[in-house]
């Protein structure tokens, strides 16, 4: 979930599509075609695409997205509403179909994902700045890592459940 200050940060960006965004999974085991992490089939309207209006979240406060939304300060909710209103309108226009819809979902995914990663980058920067300010940077080993990375549209996927090359790369930062 992007931090409020980064909501919409990449909304004007157009990201290159992976060559295999529309992979047909031919020549591989059935699991590749039957997986449950497809931008086309599995990407949810609420949690993944964030396509609920404030009114819809008020009507369904137990929805996972609603719970996150209503924990935000009011000013962040207003920013959220303005950033996602255009996305909701475009999706509900009914003009997005087939591969065009998958491409659109991919762009929304990348915009939100990179806005989220931007917050992680800034947080690491704050830790390093603090260590420098307190004179402890040269006395401290900083290690940041994570579990394996996400598929970023490769094979038409958005999660990280299979051991394919694309998601085996892991963030690793070491500062000493």
What do the predicted segments below correspond to?
Residues 1-139, 143-176:
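Active-site-proximal cap/lid insertion segments
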């Amino acid at each position: 979930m992007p931090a409020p200050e980064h909501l919409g940060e990449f909304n004007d960006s157009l990201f290159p599509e992976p060559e295999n965004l529309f992979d047909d999974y031919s020549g591989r085991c059935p699991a590749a075609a039957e997986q449950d992490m497809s931008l086309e089939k599995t990407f949810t309207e609420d949690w993944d695409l964030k396509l609920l209006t404030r009114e819809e979240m008020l009507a369904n406060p137990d929805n996972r997205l609603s719970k996150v939304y209503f924990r935000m300060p009011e000013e962040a909710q207003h920013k959220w509403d303005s950033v996602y209103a255009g996305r909701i309108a475009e999706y509900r226009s009914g003009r997005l179909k087939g591969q065009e819809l998958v491409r659109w979902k991919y762009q929304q995914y990348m915009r939100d994902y990179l806005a989220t990663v931007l917050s992680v980058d800034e947080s690491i920067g704050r830790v390093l700045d603090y260590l420098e300010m307190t004179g402890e940077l040269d006395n401290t080993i900083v290690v940041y890592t994570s579990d394996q990375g996400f598929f970023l549209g490769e094979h038409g996927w958005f999660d990280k459940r299979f051991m394919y090359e694309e998601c085996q790369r892991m963030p690793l930062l070491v500062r000493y």
